């Protein structure tokens, strides 16, 4: 019997939420700290499945660290260079793309025999473009099951040099190459083929590499230049920003139902592109206020929009369920093909579940159109082992209709106590 959670209609949502640390920033910070010279103290680290997979892998690779009892402060003793794997290793990375992709690249600096594997869904998430790029730099990589997908066997060999990579599927491939390149024997020049998706996630990578002592030059995000034979240096203390994607559910809830919700841990100068989600809510009609360390949102009459969402693919999912509350017709979210290669095929899943609550949905190859019904229907929402599906569809309870979320614990990937926090800020009808 699958676990489920029924959310009863919410009359009002109000209060302040201190955001858990960003998944994207947490796993990048752990890897950079592990490769650095010196000791790094990471604060506001996210405690979630993806981060635990990264920590487990680092332990297997000989990295020493100390984690606080609440798992949000981590002191890491850096290796001062690439990992050394003296004996064959197999690392199980669950469904953590933010661990699989960067480690696949970083471990190609090390001669050895390392297998990277994960859950069945991980074996359906493409990694061929990254493997092709690493091979151009001299890496020796074998596919153990299906061509272009994990599991992978790595034998080192990455030297750098001239590399081209397809940017149209996932920005994590470029992130993985960028973070590895400074430790390569040669300088690396990376040319991007196709349109680079999720560009703001590359900005996170560049910003964090700089914090750890490495500068990267680029020409308008089309060519990147990284000097080889460098060393990452610990910044000493590094604060992990709150997760801007996690903020999206609470900001949207305020926009739909009000009161006023303030999320802290991100603000106007955040390194994460997903803070731009608040601009989309504002465009729909919500009232948004920005501080250095917070974003605040309150209800406005929401209107349908038609927008390119390539810059905020994760947070854009929240707009798909917010669209159920928009006046004036059909909301169209465009340029979101990369939803299809995430934790599940999010475009297909979103279309199926939106129809269950009564919406009219057109699902295109890289877009979705959503026309809300006059009244939402009560439904059981499948979550596809995808944390964002569970959190997005919790917003249905902001109507006068209850909603049942199947497998609510799947939020553990990024936000283990999401439903407790939602309940804390909610006043039931």
Swiss-Prot record:
3-phosphoshikimate binds at residues 23-24, 28, 170-172, 198, 314, 338, 342. Pfam families: EPSP_synthase. The active site is at residue 314. Gene3D superfamilies: Enolpyruvate transferase domain (3.65.10.10). Phosphoenolpyruvate binds at residues 23, 97, 125, 172, 346, 388, 413. One of its GO terms (biological process) is amino acid biosynthetic process. Its EC number is 2.5.1.19. Keywords: Amino-acid biosynthesis, Aromatic amino acid biosynthesis, Cytoplasm, Transferase. Pathway: Metabolic intermediate biosynthesis; chorismate biosynthesis; chorismate from D-erythrose 4-phosphate and phosphoenolpyruvate: step 6/7. It is found in: Cytoplasm. InterPro entries: Enolpyruvate_Tfrase_dom, Enolpyruvate_Tfrase_sf, EPSP_synthase, EPSP_synthase_CS, RNA3'P_cycl/enolpyr_Trfase_a/b. It is an enzyme of class 2 (transferase). One of its GO terms (molecular function) is 3-phosphoshikimate 1-carboxyvinyltransferase activity. PROSITE patterns: EPSP_SYNTHASE_1, EPSP_SYNTHASE_2. One of its GO terms (cellular component) is cytoplasm. Its main location: cytoplasm. It comes from the Bacteria. It catalyses: 3-phosphoshikimate + phosphoenolpyruvate = 5-O-(1-carboxyvinyl)-3-phosphoshikimate + phosphate. Monomer. Belongs to the EPSP synthase family. Catalyzes the transfer of the enolpyruvyl moiety of phosphoenolpyruvate (PEP) to the 5-hydroxyl of shikimate-3-phosphate (S3P) to produce enolpyruvyl shikimate-3-phosphate and inorganic phosphate. This is 3-phosphoshikimate 1-carboxyvinyltransferase. It comes from Pectobacterium atrosepticum (strain SCRI 1043 / ATCC BAA-672) (Erwinia carotovora subsp. atroseptica). The gene is aroA.
């Amino acid at each position: 019997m699958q676990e489920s959670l029924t959310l009863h209609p919410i009359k009002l949502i109000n209060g302040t939420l201190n955001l858990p640390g960003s998944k994207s920033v947490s796993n990048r910070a752990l890897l950079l700290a592990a490769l650095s010279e010196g000791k790094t103290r990471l604060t506001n680290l996210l405690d979630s499945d993806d981060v635990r997979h990264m920590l487990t892998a680092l332990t297997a690779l000989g990295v020493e660290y100390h984690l606080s009892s609440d798992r949000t402060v981590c002191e890491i003793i850096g290796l001062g260079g690439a990992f050394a794997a003296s004996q064959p290793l197999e690392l199980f990375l669950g469904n953590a793309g933010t661990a699989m992709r960067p480690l696949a690249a970083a471990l190609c600096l090390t001669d050895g025999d390392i297998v990277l594997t994960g859950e069945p869904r991980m074996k359906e998430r493409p990694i061929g473009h990254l493997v092709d790029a690493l091979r151009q730099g001299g890496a020796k990589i074998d596919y153990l099951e299906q061509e272009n997908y994990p599991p992978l066997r790595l034998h080192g060999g990455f030297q750098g040099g001239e590399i081209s990579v397809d940017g149209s599927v996932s920005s994590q491939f470029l992130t993985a190459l960028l973070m590895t390149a400074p430790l390569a024997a040669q300088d690396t020049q990376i040319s991007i083929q196709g349109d680079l998706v999720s560009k703001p996630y590359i900005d996170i990578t560049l910003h964090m590499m700089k914090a750890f002592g490495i500068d990267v030059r680029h020409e308008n995000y089309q060519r990147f230049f990284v000097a080889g034979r460098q060393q990452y240096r610990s910044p000493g203390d590094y604060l992990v920003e709150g997760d801007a994607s996690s903020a999206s559910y609470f900001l949207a809830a305020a926009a739909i139902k009000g009161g006023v919700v303030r999320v802290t841990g991100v603000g106007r100068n955040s390194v994460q592109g997903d803070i731009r989600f608040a601009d989309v809510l504002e465009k729909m009609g919500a009232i948004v206020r920005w501080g250095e360390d917070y974003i605040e949102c309150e209800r406005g009459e929401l209107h349908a929009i038609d927008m390119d969402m390539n810059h905020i693919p994760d947070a854009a999912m929240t707009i798909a369920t917010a669209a159920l509350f928009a006046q004036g017709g059909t909301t169209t979210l465009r340029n979101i093909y990369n939803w299809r290669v995430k934790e599940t095929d999010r475009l297909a899943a979103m279309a199926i579940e939106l129809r269950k609550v009564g919406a009219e949905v057109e699902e295109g190859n890289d877009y979705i159109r959503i026309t809300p019904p006059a009244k939402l229907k009560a439904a059981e929402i499948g979550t596809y082992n995808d944390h964002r599906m569970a959190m997005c569809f919790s917003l249905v309870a902001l109507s006068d209709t209850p909603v049942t979320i199947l497998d609510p614990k799947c939020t553990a990937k990024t936000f283990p106590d999401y439903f407790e926090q939602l309940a804390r800020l909610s006043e039931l009808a």
